[in-house]
């Protein structure tokens, strides 16, 4: 049964909003063009995004035919160049850390085919319009092509300023493009996904989230077609991958810490994060008191509900995630913020940008051969002092002693 929201979320400056009291629950996995039979869903909506600066929409680059038939479209610390990280072994590796003992994964040598799916949604003409998301995709496309050898014809670009209806980031087009990204992927292929737009949270229905909420992203037609849940994205893009396939993911949106439901989360020191209910309880209590003082009764209620769910099933949810959401492939994701945080737009190099997208490209331009953990640290250094968000690193497997370079250069 579907639930309608009681009220839209409050306005905000960022790419998402606090957890709503009720939201349209995840739909069964369906990869056919929308709409299905029946009435469209109801949703809570991302908040209006207030910006004080103009941002002209960039002109897409010339069209090159692709297999998917899409047109193409400072506060930084002084660091010395990181030492070149070691290459990982190519043989199958054991998971450990609570995963089944017989289950193994394999790193990618990144010597095969390269594909990229880049999604930027400004929500043009909608109350929650953003400014920098299309710019993010334009810059990421150029960066991948010039620095890492991704061919234009092997990129699918979805932005809401295009004329071709297949290139608009609707829910149906996004799901179909995600399928295209991973279709027939072979060991040592390099796949890349970048999403810049609104994100949010919805009550978890399958028990795999420690905090009781799934992360979601919002297509341009979310008011009609609905959001896309992390479980669905995992099922499309992670579960089908074979051992040795690399999938690198960038989610520049709010509440995106576990947007692909990857079970292993790392800190800047490389230590696998474990749930700390005692610490989170204190934080939740402080959040509840702060919300009450601001008159935000819904914030009090959601904080209390979230903590009760954590206390009741946090540990079991993590075990369930490790048992069911690992992958024999080589999947790594950088997200713009923790599950409970919002992500900001910024104004850099004369244009509106997403903070994570900007810091990701800037860090790799300065130091191309970084490990995942080095890159996480350098991204945070770029953002430190400007934004409260803390980008996250999560993986489909434990990183172990071997640390792969964040993105491999062409062979």
From Swiss-Prot:
Enzyme Commission designation: 3.4.22.-
Pfam families with a match to the protein in the record: Peptidase_C14
GO BP field: apoptotic process; proteolysis
InterPro entries listed in its UniProt record: Caspase-like_dom_sf (IPR029030), Metacaspase (IPR050452), Pept_C14_caspase (IPR011600)
UniProt entry keywords in alphabetical sequence: Apoptosis, Hydrolase, Protease, Thiol protease, Zymogen
Start-end of Pro residues biased regions: 7-65
Residues spanning the membrane: none
Active site feature: 198, 254
Keyword Hydrolase: yes
Chain intervals for the UniProt region annotation (Disordered): 1-97
Record-level Gene Ontology MF annotations: cysteine-type endopeptidase activity
GO CC term (a single one): cytoplasm
Keyword Phosphoprotein listed: no
Stored PANTHER family: METACASPASE (EUROFUNG), METACASPASE-4
Function comment: Involved in cell death (apoptosis).
Membership in a protein family: Belongs to the peptidase C14B family.
Name of the protein described by the UniProt record: Metacaspase-1B
Organism: Neosartorya fischeri (strain ATCC 1020 / DSM 3700 / CBS 544.65 / FGSC A1164 / JCM 1740 / NRRL 181 / WB 181)
Taxon lineage: Eukaryota, Fungi, Dikarya, Ascomycota, Pezizomycotina
């Amino acid at each position: 049964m579907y639930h309608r929201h009681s009220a839209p979320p409050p306005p905000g400056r960022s790419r998402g909003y606090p957890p709503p009291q009720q939201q349209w629950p995840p739909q069964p996995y369906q990869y056919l063009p929308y709409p299905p039979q029946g009435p469209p869903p109801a949703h809570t909506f991302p908040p209006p995004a207030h910006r004080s600066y103009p941002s002209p929409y960039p002109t897409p680059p010339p069209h090159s035919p692709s297999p998917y038939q899409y047109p193409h479209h400072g506060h930084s610390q002084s660091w010395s160049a990181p030492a070149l990280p070691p290459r990982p072994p190519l043989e199958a590796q054991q998971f450990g850390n609570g995963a089944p003992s017989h289950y193994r994964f394999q790193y990618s040598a990144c010597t095969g085919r390269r594909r990229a799916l880049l999604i930027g949604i400004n929500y043009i003409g909608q109350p929650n319009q953003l400014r920098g998301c299309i710019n993010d995709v334009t810059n990421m496309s150029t960066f991948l092509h010039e620095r890492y050898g991704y061919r234009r014809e092997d990129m699918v670009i979805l932005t809401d300023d295009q004329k071709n209806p297949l290139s608009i980031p609707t829910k149906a087009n996004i799901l179909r493009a995600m399928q295209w990204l991973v279709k027939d992927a072979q060991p040592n292929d390099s796949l890349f996904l970048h999403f810049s737009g609104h994100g949010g949270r919805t009550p978890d229905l399958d028990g795999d989230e420690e905090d009781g909420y799934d992360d979601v992203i919002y297509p341009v037609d979310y008011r009609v077609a609905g959001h896309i849940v992390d479980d669905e994205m995992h099922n499309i893009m992670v579960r089908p991958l074979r051992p040795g396939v690399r999938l690198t993911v960038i989610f520049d949106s709010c509440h995106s810490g576990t947007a692909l439901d990857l079970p292993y989360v790392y800190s800047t020191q490389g230590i696998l994060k474990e749930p700390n209910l005692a610490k989170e309880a204190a934080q939740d209590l402080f959040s509840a008191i702060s919300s009450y003082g601001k008159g935000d009764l819904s914030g009090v209620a959601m904080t209390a509900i979230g903590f009760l769910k954590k206390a009741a099933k946090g540990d079991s949810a993590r075990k369930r995630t490790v048992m069911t959401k690992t992958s024999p492939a080589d999947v790594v994701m950088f997200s713009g913020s923790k599950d409970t945080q919002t992500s900001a737009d910024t104004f850099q190099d004369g244009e509106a940008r997403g903070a994570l997208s900007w810091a990701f490209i800037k860090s790799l331009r300065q130091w191309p051969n970084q490990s995942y953990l080095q890159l996480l640290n350098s991204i945070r250094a770029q953002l430190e002092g400007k934004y409260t968000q803390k980008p996250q690193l999560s993986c489909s497997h434990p990183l172990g002693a071997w640390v792969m370079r964040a993105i491999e250069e062409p062979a």
